Amino acid sequence: KGAYPDLILRVYDERHADVYRRALNAAETLGWEIVAADFDSRRIEATDTTLWFRFKDDIVITFGTQSNNVVVNARSTSRVGVGDVGANANRLRAFFALMDMP
């Protein structure tokens, strides 16, 4: 959070089902492999494979509620290596860019 202040929780004034569907579509559009998607548990788990070295990175998207709004939190972590040279942050920026499109 501190290193990437633009990657904060997003709040949407929409129905939970609509936000969840849009998140799932965004993940699929980005080419992520959906590992688990469970509307009832408000969670999507996915894997993205890097182009050059074929490293697998894990993404978890969770959904909550706040004052009749849907709160979306997304995290991306690399399975190998110490640093990712911003790949995880860029992955989440691409995801939220799709989520925030009208």
What name fits each language-model region?
Residues 1-102:
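Ser/Thr-rich, low-complexity intrinsically disordered terminal regions
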